[in-house]
Amino acid sequence: MGYPELLRVLGEEAAREAREVRAAADRECARILSEARAAADGARAAVLARVREESEAHRRASREAIALERERALLVERRRQLERLRLEALARLRGAGGPALDAALLAELLPEAGDGPLEVIVDPGAEAEVGRALASLDPAVAARAAVRAAPEARGGVALVAGRRVLDDTLPSRLDRAWTVLEAEVARLLFGEG
């Protein structure tokens, strides 16, 4: 084998080795590219999943906030309607007083009156009737009691005995009853419970 033949064989060998190195480099490049694509696809899928979860959480929070605001507005409206009903009942009660009612309420209060001087506060114009009712219920109490008119009609009577004020007016009775009955009234009006 001569020098030219040796050069040719060495050239072929170098070309073959170069092809093998290029093929190995191409395979390694394809492997690295495939791994990079798989990693990018995984990262993209993870980011998309997280974005979907965050978006769903945001939508859920928005729906809950809207529902909460709707419930709050409904509660405010129901409270407003209940208060309007209470005020309407109060207005009707103010005109419901009369001598018979005043006498009945006075009879309930007298046992709690005590022994000192008394002041009986009644609707304007009802002083004489209540004075007569008081005298017929208990003349001794009537002797130590002063009957005076309230600034405005409210229905019922109030009894002042020293520092104690025994309020048996219709608005006072409504206030006491309202705390007990408000839930039942709401249930009847709004179908709750």
From Swiss-Prot:
Which keywords does the record carry?
Answer: ATP synthesis, Hydrogen ion transport, Ion transport, Transport
Gene Ontology CC, one term:
proton-transporting two-sector ATPase complex, catalytic domain
Query: What InterPro entries does this protein's entry cite?
Result: ATPase_E_C, ATPase_V1_Esu
* Membrane-traversing stretches: none
Q: Name one GO molecular function term.
A: proton-transporting ATPase activity, rotational mechanism
Q: Which domain of life does the UniProt lineage start with?
A: Bacteria
Q: Which GO terms describe its biological process?
A: proton motive force-driven plasma membrane ATP synthesis
Q: Which family does it belong to?
A: Belongs to the V-ATPase E subunit family.
This molecule's function is given as:
Produces ATP from ADP in the presence of a proton gradient across the membrane.
Any idea what this protein is called?
V-type ATP synthase subunit E
What gene does this protein come from? atpE
